[in-house]
């Protein structure tokens, strides 16, 4: 039986109850077989093109970098059906579930974007769907909850722990360990136990592949850097995957600094965490001196995750990718700037990557540089959050 690497350097692995090992082994083999099956790949590509709307555009932001010599492009995953990059890999995993003969899907969601993507894929492909969501997130993301329910998903609020994403993850895994014979756990990011980080990367890889072709067609060269926000890390690894071997291209991931890295209210485990075991993997983790998981924080629910995907941890460890952090205030400023100067309302998650790119442009205005930001999602889900913050600050 062919096997995928379970580790990226020292990170990754499969730290799960023994009962789940057969399900993960079955998933790994099904994925390997599917990747080698031209019919599966053709069905996946057809769904991406005809249902999801790929390829997505690469947009030059002419107004954002005025006064500098930076050319800034956005990879427009916000234009994908469902409103974010999540749709890509969800369609892939849902097809995989059908291939394995499973008719139920379990998922977890934070901001609700992965839940919405899972619900739409299940509606399309005729699968039953239940989504675990922290009770706090159910409150702050009510439009997405209703979207999921409209498409036939059962949304299950999780009240344990901090009632956020990490608790939803734990409940989803608990459910799967009791139902794995009929259900597939459709994990929402490039993290968790092997083989999920690899599967999610491969089902998001087209982001970087398209970007490479589009930028070569537009500019005749590769970008100096590709920049993406990092929570669990799926949109970033989707952008990075096809550029890892291109050593001239900097890979820049942006974690949420929340209210400041020097406070305890951030979500930056890569730079400020310690290695531990969480969610079935070995990875950097926000934990206290007793090894207990600390609460992560970000204005963006989708980045509010106390760990990070193992391949990002490895890319950071070997110096192939660099990871910065952007505060809530910096992300909000970038959100406003993009809306007012380009007529694009980005997700708060994506606004972190945009803020970092704008800082690079402004730091060296005379430097000619070609940057691509992965605009991983649209900001419809965030307008009420932003409205309340701006009102509190007296800006509206």
From Swiss-Prot:
Domain of life per record: Bacteria
Enzymatic reactions: (1S,2R)-1-C-(indol-3-yl)glycerol 3-phosphate + L-serine = D-glyceraldehyde 3-phosphate + L-tryptophan + H2O
A cellular component term, taken from the record's GO annotations: cytoplasm
Enzyme superclass (EC): lyase
SUPFAM superfamilies given in the database record: Tryptophan synthase beta subunit-like PLP-dependent enzymes
GO MF entries: tryptophan synthase activity
Modified residues (N6-(pyridoxal phosphate)lysine): 86
Enzyme Commission (EC) number: 4.2.1.20
Needed co-factor(s): pyridoxal 5'-phosphate
TM ranges: none
UniProt KW keywords: Amino-acid biosynthesis, Aromatic amino acid biosynthesis, Lyase, Pyridoxal phosphate, Tryptophan biosynthesis
Involved pathway(s): Amino-acid biosynthesis; L-tryptophan biosynthesis; L-tryptophan from chorismate: step 5/5
UniProt keyword Phosphoprotein present: no
Family that this chain belongs to: Belongs to the TrpB family.
Task performed by this protein: The beta subunit is responsible for the synthesis of L-tryptophan from indole and L-serine.
Subunit structure: Tetramer of two alpha and two beta chains.
HAMAP family: Trp_synth_beta
Protein name: Tryptophan synthase beta chain
Species the sequence originates in: Aliivibrio fischeri (strain MJ11)
Name of the coding gene: trpB
